[in-house]
Amino acid sequence: DCPSSIGKPSPLQDTYWKLKKSESVQDQKKADIFSRRHSFSCLIQVIKDDHNKELEGKILNFRFGIKVWEKIQSELKPPIGEPNNPFDLLKGKLFSLKITKVSGFNNYDQSKFVDKAIPLVIPDEKGKLVPITEKTDKALVFTFLKEHSADLTKHAYKEWDQDTYNYVNQ
């Protein structure tokens, strides 16, 4: 976590901008070492997983990069067509996650939103997963989400201690 992500001074950011604004092409290339790698995360519900059937129906924290973020933005603000909020509990579209390897790195180019809207599914009295509807008790949905969602506090910003500042300033 860089302190600049919450508006605090950062020696990493200072070094990045010093190198980036340099007239030296070598320094500008070195700036890439200090540039940020954007990552995002959200809660998702696994609808189908052929490799891990036990994950189906579970709510997990999904961490992703810029490629998936751009796909989400295209759903929210499409160049043509109707916008769709993929996070809508009733009308969110299914996201088909297809990960391939390109030059040894995970590639998400083949992942896409499917035209089919899929609501959140919760277990009924018998444990069978059933889709929620507008008539589903909101308190039931809230309780399900609260009790079954991943703990996101471990992903919160972590303040640097003096050891971290000392290490970065070496």
Predicted regions and their residues:
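OB-fold ssDNA-binding interfaces and closely related basic DNA-contact patches used
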Residues: 1-87, 151-167
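Extended serine/threonine-enriched, polar tracts that run as long, contiguous segments within proteins
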Residues: 61-151
